[in-house]
């Protein structure tokens, strides 16, 4: 269900409700960090995703696992929210809700999400340079980087911000040269 329109339609009101709660308590960033942690855990564990999505597993078992897994590591408002999702049988949409919450948080804080694909891991200096360029291009106050490694790029980076793609990879440059040469002959 990841990324489906149906999932987004259900997740959005829950994410907005969580954002309203977080704003009223001035804990938007804290909840955002907790949502990132939850997304990381879900990304790492297919078993957990299957467990919380299973209609066969009892709600009390889901609550128990979530409490043991997340314990006091997340804000108690978010923990209560997760228990509500279990009770309402909406925990299956947890990933979409967290992603939607983070999108709302980025909008609130004038932050853009940039997906950067590079041939190798970026150094701290390269990360700063990419962030500075993205800020200049978008006018955003801050940038959240999501990095991916693709050795096939040979060198350089591909940066995706929203629907815009900036291809500064060696593979992209070679492709553009090839197109211009075949078009010129």
UniProtKB/Swiss-Prot annotation:
GO CC, alphabetical: plasma membrane-derived thylakoid membrane; proton-transporting ATP synthase complex
Name assigned to this protein: ATP synthase subunit delta
Keyword Ribosomal protein (UniProt): no
Organism this protein belongs to: Crocosphaera subtropica (strain ATCC 51142 / BH68) (Cyanothece sp. (strain ATCC 51142))
GO function terms (MF aspect): proton-transporting ATP synthase activity, rotational mechanism
SUPFAM superfamilies: N-terminal domain of the delta subunit of the F1F0-ATP synthase (SSF47928)
Membrane topology: Peripheral membrane protein
Family of the protein in this entry: Belongs to the ATPase delta chain family.
Localization: Cellular thylakoid membrane
Record carries keyword Cell division: no
Pfam families: OSCP (PF00213)
HAMAP family: ATP_synth_delta_bact
Keywords: ATP synthesis, CF(1), Hydrogen ion transport, Ion transport, Membrane, Thylakoid, Transport
Quaternary context: F-type ATPases have 2 components, F(1) - the catalytic core - and F(0) - the membrane proton channel. F(1) has five subunits: alpha(3), beta(3), gamma(1), delta(1), epsilon(1). CF(0) has four main subunits: a(1), b(1), b'(1) and c(10-14). The alpha and beta chains form an alternating ring which encloses part of the gamma chain. F(1) is attached to F(0) by a central stalk formed by the gamma and epsilon chains, while a peripheral stalk is formed by the delta, b and b' chains.
Cross-referenced PANTHER family: ATP SYNTHASE DELTA CHAIN (PTHR11910)
Function text: F(1)F(0) ATP synthase produces ATP from ADP in the presence of a proton or sodium gradient. F-type ATPases consist of two structural domains, F(1) containing the extramembraneous catalytic core and F(0) containing the membrane proton channel, linked together by a central stalk and a peripheral stalk. During catalysis, ATP synthesis in the catalytic domain of F(1) is coupled via a rotary mechanism of the central stalk subunits to proton translocation. This protein is part of the stalk that links CF(0) to CF(1). It either transmits conformational changes from CF(0) to CF(1) or is implicated in proton conduction.
NCBIfam families: ATP_synt_delta (TIGR01145)
